[in-house]
Amino acid sequence: MRWDSIIWDLDDDPDGNVQHCAEHGVTKEEVEEVFQNAADADISRSSGRPVVFGDTSTGRHLMVVYEEIDAATVYPVTAYDVPGSQNP
């Protein structure tokens, strides 16, 4: 599950993926860490989109919902702390 490119919307786009992640207190850098170090993958029960789970360097256990554009490119839709996890 390695991708070469992650597509980000403009930071100030209120409907963009950067803002969707920020609403949950997750930064672009944290999302990129999870993509690089994904520990598990699944399908979101609510959206039907693929998700990856992983830890950040600060110890947060995150879930990233994404769309795979092609074999090398992903578009993160949103990200948040895994429910029930003990995050710093």
Give short role names for the model-derived ranges.
Residues 1-88:
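Ribonuclease/tRNase effector modules and their secretory precursors
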